[in-house]
């Protein structure tokens, strides 16, 4: 009897997800902004924007995880004590923005689209939620320590870890062993071939949503770097404002009004912020 060829053998879901996201991972990995970050070119203002972006993502993700924690399509990979990042990000934002951080953190159109998709998945297609959880949590768990050290050195942060709680997973003794457990649980999820393919496609969507964040900022840079004079700074502010107004209405977390802080950002902030955003995704997913 003919034996099945290796390429035709069924693939674990975790391996299928990693394979399917190779192309989009390469797009992020080869970005010049990632190389900038690896050189330690990140400012405090840029880092603050990144942390605010992560907060919006994780608030939406973890809200939908809680709604679906008892569902068979997600329950096996429900690890709130080990993985959830909202509380850690709240600590970090208080450090970076002060006690009234909720009133001042930015919420860009691309971030709104990301949050909207997370809520759509959680409420209408919860079987796809695992794609977002896998992409985010294992990526951040894998690359977090590398990014933490780079940021700590570049920003002159204390060794105590203040402002970097997001990158610390105190309830995970061994990242390697936990990732093995998580993959095993994920591979045990029962799903039809059709659902499995949708999960794989959703993982690509998750990655592309991250890349869209970079593209949004890059678009602002492309227009405004044509004229470097200080008098052109309002142009960046006006485009950022128009972009937010022209975007389709989306649901904001906990009724929060989107805040547009582009008007207060110097041009250099966007370059350095992009470098860190790309590194956050690319380094993390590369190590998954």
From Swiss-Prot:
Q: By which gene is this protein encoded?
A: HMOX1
Name of the protein in its database record: Heme oxygenase 1
Q: Does the keyword Oxidoreductase apply?
A: yes
**What modifications follow translation?**
A soluble form arises by proteolytic removal of the membrane anchor.
Question: What does UniProt list as this organism's lineage?
Answer: Eukaryota, Metazoa, Chordata, Craniata, Vertebrata
Catalyses: heme b + 3 reduced [NADPH--hemoprotein reductase] + 3 O2 = biliverdin IXalpha + CO + Fe(2+) + 3 oxidized [NADPH--hemoprotein reductase] + 3 H2O + H(+)
Which E.C. number(s) belong to this protein?
Answer: 1.14.14.18
PANTHER family, per database record: HEME OXYGENASE, HEME OXYGENASE 1
Record text about domains: The transmembrane domain is necessary for its oligomerization.
The PTM Phosphoserine maps to: 229
State the GO CC annotations.
endoplasmic reticulum membrane
Taken from the record's topology, the Cytoplasmic segments are 1-265
């Amino acid at each position: 009897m003919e034996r099945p060829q290796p390429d035709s053998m069924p693939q674990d879901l975790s391996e299928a997800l990693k394979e399917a996201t190779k192309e989009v991972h390469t797009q992020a990995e080869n970005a010049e902004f990632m190389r900038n970050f690896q050189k330690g070119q990140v400012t405090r203002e840029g880092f603050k924007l990144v942390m605010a972006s992560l907060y919006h993502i994780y608030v939406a993700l973890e809200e939908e995880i809680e709604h679906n924690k008892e569902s068979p399509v997600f329950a096996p990979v429900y690890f709130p004590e080990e993985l959830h990042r909202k509380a850690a990000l709240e600590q970090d934002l208080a450090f970076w923005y002060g006690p009234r951080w909720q009133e001042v953190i930015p919420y860009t159109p691309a971030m709104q689209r990301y949050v909207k998709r997370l809520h759509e998945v959680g409420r209408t297609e919860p079987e796809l939620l695992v794609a977002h959880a896998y992409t985010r949590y294992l990526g951040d768990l894998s690359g977090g320590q590398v990014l933490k050290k780079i940021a700590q050195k570049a920003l002159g942060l204390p060794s105590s870890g203040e402002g970097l709680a997001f990158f610390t997973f105190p309830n995970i003794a061994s990242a390697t062993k936990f990732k093995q457990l998580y993959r095993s649980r994920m591979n045990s999820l029962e799903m039809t071939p059709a659902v499995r393919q949708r999960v794989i496609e959703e993982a690509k969507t998750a990655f592309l949503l991250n890349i869209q964040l970079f593209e949004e900022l890059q678009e602002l840079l492309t227009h405004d770097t044509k004229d470097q004079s200080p008098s052109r700074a309002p142009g960046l502010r006006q485009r950022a404002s128009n972009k937010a107004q022209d975007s389709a209405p989306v649901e904001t977390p906990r009724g929060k009004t989107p805040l547009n802080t582009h008007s207060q950002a110097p041009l250099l902030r966007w370059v350095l912020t992009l470098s860190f955003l790309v590194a956050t995704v690319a380094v993390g997913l590369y190590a998954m």
